Amino acid sequence: MRLTLPDFFAELDGFTERIPLDFLTHRLTKLEVSLDEFRQYLQFGANTYRRNLIHEGLCYQALVLCWRSGQRSPIHDHRGSTCGVRVLSGVAIETLFDQTEGGWIYATGSHALGENQVCGSQDSDIHQVSNLRPRGENLVSLHIYSPALLVMGTYSLTDVTRGEFTDPIYAFADGAGI
């Protein structure tokens, strides 16, 4: 059976608490969408990626993230939130990190996610998402956070201090978005 974006959101709206990661990534894999369905939300930031809110339910937020070449997220965790990501257009590079007993982080690997590929993370998983494609090759990804990810723990390769990052979310007016 075809899983449309409205059907997907209706499924997520049925949850009254945090959505399990395996459910989220499985349903993102089954989702049948095209980039055209998200055109009104494709807003890019000049200096950093941009998080565009497209839908909000009781226990989740759905955002379209728009990345220009060279833009990347901070190295971060998901602090009490589950995150499922589906690449809508372009290629995302996800770099995974682990932490030593002393608090230092180190990369354990990177992998490319092409169009329609899905990944997921939650809680203390540490990662970074990047668009490392040549200039002019944008990345667009759909992110579902359950519950909403409003503050991330951030990490540095040169310091053991865990920071906090509040990533702005852009909502839409005039009938678009929520």
Where are these regions (language model features)?
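Conserved short histidine dyad/triad with adjacent acidic residue
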Residues: 63-78, 122-124
